[in-house]
Amino acid sequence: MSKKETKKNRPLFTEFTLDMFSRSSGRSHSEIKQFNQWRDEIIEADKYTFETPHLTPQTPEISVRRIHGDEHQLVNFSSYNYLGYANHPEVIQAAKDALDTFGLGATGSPVLNGTFDIHKKLEDALTNFYGQKGYGVSLFSSGYGANVGVVSSYIHKGDYVVLDHSSHASLIDGAVMSQGTVKLFRHNDAEFLEKILKRISKENRRILVCVEGVYSTDGDYGNLKDLVAVSKKYGASILVDEAHSLLIAGKTGKGAVEEFDVLSEVDLVIGTFSKSFGGVGGCVYAKKELINYMNYYARSRMFSCALDPAVTGGILKALELAAGPDGDQKRKRIIENADYLRSLLKDKVNIGTSQSWVIPVIFGDERKSLPLGDHLMRLGFDFSIMMFPAVKKNQSIIRAFVTSEHTKEQLDGCAEALIQASKEFNFNI
């Protein structure tokens, strides 16, 4: 059999990748048909691990049902329930109490009739948590919506948004929606950023530099000290997205802005409730006059329903716990767990520049993604397999989220599974 014939008979999922279906074919809709054919072949080969329904809460050990009906007991490294608050009994009870008091949904825009007393309590609690006079908080129904709404309402046509090359999709989408001019700088490179700012600052336009506290695929900290200093030097405003660092980084959990002592110099801090808080939603912390403005001009807030009251009640309790001794203990434990897992993996697999509880294992070739995800699940572990467009082309990763709730035995098993897979799929060091 010729090489051409062999390739022709291979399953589509070993040859095609997601980017091949992202271009319009016009009225034929052929990319949609081809995508579904690609997906169907993955399912038929029993390699499909995406969208797998969970039968249990997001704890370190979970039960899932795969698409053909078989159930698996897995050690969970794919959830960002970093501090375990999604399942904490006090958080659950607080959510139940809010459900009984306020009902299931807010059923209205926060600007019109969707704001409840419990929303104001959460805004006040978050403002007090950060502790700066003259500041406030605005709530959003998702972290994605917070970034999109904040960036697109702060920046207008003729202004500039300057993004790190590793920026989350929500920051990119907010920048595009703003109609401002978008500039990109090399990841965490303050000198590269300075070259951009030096040139564009002469135009006397508003400039917003967007960075992250901890990067969601690389797992490294944002170079906040240097990036903030350069931004301020050229009169740029700076936004820090703390989605993966709020409640964890910093002595009291205020995030990377506390870890690197730049809170007072940052203009906008974005928080996400779906990770360390264990709920869903997002927020922005900024000067009160800016919060008042964004409440009306952030379209993702104005034209979305307000946060569910029950979820808001749970988030409020999670914040209370995280700001006290419980949070101190969990922060210590998650950092110890992450350090331990990195120590087991380094020199065995490529974990890039990870410094946090987000640990990527880089395997590169995205054609390995689907068989690799299936292989790891059959070993008894659930990871996030990330390929383009979530990461750069041919930079696919297995992403492990470490939590405060993982045991040493689970971390040992995680390292063993990843190292075994790296040999099986030929991406070991």
Locations of regions flagged by a protein language model:
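PLP-dependent enzyme catalytic core of the Aspartate aminotransferase-like
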Residues: 2-11, 89, 93-97, 101, ...
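N-terminal "arm"/small-domain region of PLP-dependent enzymes with the aminotransferase-like
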Residues: 2-22, 26, 31-104, 236
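Conserved PLP-binding catalytic core of the aspartate aminotransferase-like
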Residues: 18, 330-339, 348-379, 390, ...
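Active-site phosphate-binding strand-loop segment of PLP-dependent enzymes
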Residues: 81, 183, 187-240
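Conserved N-terminal alpha-helix of the aminotransferase class I/II PLP-enzyme fold
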Residues: 92-141
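Conserved PLP-anchoring active-site segment centered on the Schiff-base-forming lysine
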Residues: 150-169
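Active-site PLP attachment segment
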Residues: 252, 258-293
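PLP-dependent aminotransferase class I/II
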Residues: 276-343, 349-352
